[in-house]
Amino acid sequence: MEEYEEFCEKALGRAQEASLSTGSFLPAQAESVSLIRFHGVAVLSPLLTIEKRKKIQEEKQKALDVQSRKQANRKKALLTRVQEILENVQVRKAPNASDFDQWATETIYSNPEVTDLNVPVRVPNSLPSPTEHCTSVKLEKITGLLPVNNEDQQTPKRVGLPGDSEVSGSLRQCESPESRQAEDGAALRLSSASPQETIISDVLGKEEQDPSCLAEVTPDPYIMSLQNLMKRSKEYVERELSSRSLRNSLKRSVNETHSDRENDAAKASDCVKEKAPPMPIGRHCGSAIPDKPSLNKSNVLLQGASQASSMGTAGLASFSKIDLPAGAAPPAAPDAGSDFTVIPTFVTENKVKSLKGPYAKLPSPEPSMSPTMHRRHSRSASACQILINNPVNACELSPKGKEEAVDRTAPAAAETTNESETVPKSPTDLTGVCSSNVSATKITSESTREMVVGKPSQRQQALGAHLGNNVTVERSAMEGPFIADDRGAQKVDGTCMAVPKLHELQPSSQCVSSQTLEDVCELKSASLLAKNSCNLQMELNKSYDVKHPSPLLTQTQTSRQQMDTPPVFRGNEQFVDNSFEKVKRRLDLDVDSLQKENCPYIITAGVAEQERDRLLERRYPKGFVHINKNKMLETSPKEGQELLKSKMLAFEEMRKRLEEQHAQQLSLLIAEQEREQEQLQKEIEEQEKMLKEKAVTTDVSDLNSALEWRQRTDSALLETMLSQVDSLQTSNNSGFITSALQYSFGSAGEAPFYLWGSLTSGVTRVSGTRPCGRAQAKWSQVFNPEIHAKFNKITAVAKGFLTRKLMQTDKLKQLRQTVKDTMEFIRSFQSEAPLKRGVVSAQDASLQERVLAQLRAALYGIHDIFFVMDAAERMSILHHDREARKEKLLRQMDKMKSPRVALSVATQKSLDRKKFMKVAEMGMPNKKFLLKQNPSETRVLQPNQGQNAPVHRLLSRQGTPKTSVKGVVQNRQKPSQSRVPNRAPVSGAYAGKTQRKRPNVATI
């Protein structure tokens, strides 16, 4: 061992080297786990291991990295935003005051706060000439990149470039901000609070030549400074927050705002003609006014637009949508100076192209009152390119909404005649009015198909009952009028794909309320033929392109089809549906049993009706199916009543049959129960007679009879309980109480006879309704001192028998023999002592001590067997002795049968095998011992044979310890008996030692 100081120095040197290798000594102390140190060595084992501590430190470091990364990203975003503002302002050039005036005007007119306050957006009377704007492209970049007061947080960053080579910069500059945003392809809500549309007059040259009407404003000398820019950016953020809060408050307070009006209106959608000349005049509906943030598939819109541009069709059926205030009357005639505009070709081209932009995405499916997009992706108002063809109202989601929609839209059809006359009839009027909002044929066909068809007098009230959408029917595809209701809601009737079928319709100038049922059916079929790839299951998915909707959607779709019937039959339909549902609920579980009972005529009526509906839906289009449903519903109350009567009759018959079967089963069970009770009573009477006859006999016979009576009554109780359980299971709410229950009450709480000693109360075992009425013996009579003495006598007899058997075992015989031998030796030793005259040698004294020890050990062994051992150990001694006796008997039988001749080893083994087989047949235990004991006998008989020596070693090593010890004891007892005078003490001492260990060996 080295010195302690040397050990400490070495440990300190190792610690210092480790700390120097990682860095300095102090960080090593800081990173170390233990706080208690001795010369720099940690002496306290840490609670945390080094790996766990490192893991915790890594997790902390990760969290800190994430936090620092977030802060760096925020700072970077702010810096990039400020840098963009700086770069954009540095690009701007301001040669004169008119630029700043124009920029201020554009900023004001693009501010949604002005439009939210119901201020009509107006175009300035004069626009600057192109000569004053030599850098037109740069100016457009500036106006597109300036921080405009939008409704969303994102600043528009699109660069507006000329979309066509023939377009000059002056023409684009002369447009208002609304037309420029429409050119960029955004489906923007322009002035939703104002009833007018922003229009650019066609007298363009005059306005271009009059720049003097602009108000002259002196330029701000600090417009280029950095502090001013930072101040403006802060003000911009504050304005965004204030405008958002203002917009939310306006939504809650004002009922006349744009969101309430637009939620009742449909989407304006026009067809695109790419190469049309810019001269024709039509309604400008470039603003897409969504009802809810739900989007039909944009691919269909793009395909429809491209097909329209390639086909070059001139006659297009289109409705346009005009936002009217709630109390304002619709315009009587179009005003060419204010309500119409010249739409160039590049405007429509760019609007179609902008559908493929990055903002043509699905909106959030959350419902909202406002038509603006959710702030999941914050966008500016100019970037709102979401197109909605058929908005989903809240009344579509509940069947009650249809009835409310009838009351809400009933006055809509009254003004359609006056409104339809105010529109020019030329088919070329609509060619220039081509925006990117191309309507899909699915919406038109579905809206026309699901329009309520009733009697002519009720058609005006039923108009628009299609889930709250104000649906009107176009009169002709070639005339191209629009029909507006009092809320300004209009619906596109057909698109470019539906034109060939719409030409086949008969034009008429009548209102929808005066149309006949056949015209509406023809219009339905034509609209349905135009519906190419849209099936019925896709109707609910108004916002998404779902080819395989979930079963829940299809289930609600079928319920919608069933509810699409005229309100005239509403009461009858509800009555029939309610009655059908009640009967179906009651008889759902009875249909199978009715089929088994050969009553198929009841089920066939409902099945036939379902099959008829399926066949009608397969053979005819949906329009004809609706008409047939209307015809069928006229006769449905009678059929429903007949079906209800037949089902109720069948139900009554089945109920009667079940009652009869139930009563029959109950009668059988009652009879069987009575038979069992009579049999039990007979058995009890017989037992009582037997007990009366045996009452004169001795007490032992009384005890036996009581026990027998107890057993019999217990078995009778078990039988009654089993029969009671069977009767309760088979009777099935029979309503009667079996008399077997009465037998179980008196004996339910009784205990078996081996628990009698724990019962001290004298409970009378009397059964309540026994016919004999005789009370049983009390517990005090059965459990008396005499019976106690008899039980004690039984146990004493058993103990005496077992004690005698123990005394007869070989083990106790050996112990008794040892005690007898040692006592004789001690007596002989004491008798010989006077002859030697008191002179005792040391050898004799030690011999006497050993004999006394052997005697003491034998006496202790006997005492342990009878007073210390458990009963199980004593029984094991008896069991072992019984097995030894059987083996001894077998050996004696073999000796008597086999001749006394010398046998070879092979012959002896074969004989042993035969003996083993015989023992196995007899079922004797300890076969291994018997098989191994025979060679030992052979060795004893023939000690000169050397081949038997390994067998003896096996016996001494693997034989049972009981037999080996027994053999040793026997061999030592024989010389002790023969050599008592001279050498008996030595053998006796050894025998005593083995006998002291003997009980432990025998009880293993």
Swiss-Prot record:
**Positions of the region CEP97 binding?**
1-221
Q: What does the record say about PTM?
A: Phosphorylated by CDKs.
Stretch list, region Disordered:
147-194, 239-279, 401-433, 955-1004
Q: Where is the composition biased (Polar residues)?
A: 415-433, 970-980
Feature: compositional bias, Basic residues: 994-1004
The reply to whether Glycoprotein figures as a keyword in the UniProt entry is no
GO BP field: centriole replication; centrosome duplication; ciliary basal body organization; negative regulation of cilium assembly; positive regulation of cilium assembly; regulation of cytokinesis
Where mainly located?
cytoplasm
Task: List, as start-end ranges, the regions of compositional bias called Low complexity.
Answer: 243-252
Q: Which GO terms describe its cellular component?
A: centriole; centrosome; cilium; cytoplasm; microtubule organizing center; protein-containing complex
Which is a Pfam family this sequence falls into?
A: CaM_bind
Q: State what the entry records as the consequence of deleting this gene.
A: Lethal within a few hours after birth with multiple defects in organogenesis. Mice show an early block in cilia formation and a phenotype reminiscent of human short rib-polydactyly syndrome.
Which portions of this protein are annotated as coiled-coil regions? Answer: 51-90, 641-699
Q: What residue ranges are annotated as transmembrane?
A: none
Q: Share what the entry says about its subunit structure, partners included.
A: Interacts with CALM1, CETN2, CEP76, CEP104, CEP290 and TALPID3. Interacts with CEP97. Seems to associate with discrete CETN2, CEP97 and CEP290-containing complexes. Interacts with NEURL4 and CCNF; these interactions are not mutually exclusive and both lead to CCP110 ubiquitination and proteasome-dependent degradation. Via its interaction with NEURL4, may indirectly interact with HERC2. Interacts with KIF24, leading to its recruitment to centrioles. Interacts with USP20 and USP33. Interacts with MPHOSPH9.
Query: Know the name of this protein?
Result: Centriolar coiled-coil protein of 110 kDa
Species this chain originates from: Mus musculus (Mouse)
Source taxonomy lineage?
Answer: Eukaryota, Metazoa, Chordata, Craniata, Vertebrata
Question: Which gene does this sequence derive from?
Answer: Ccp110
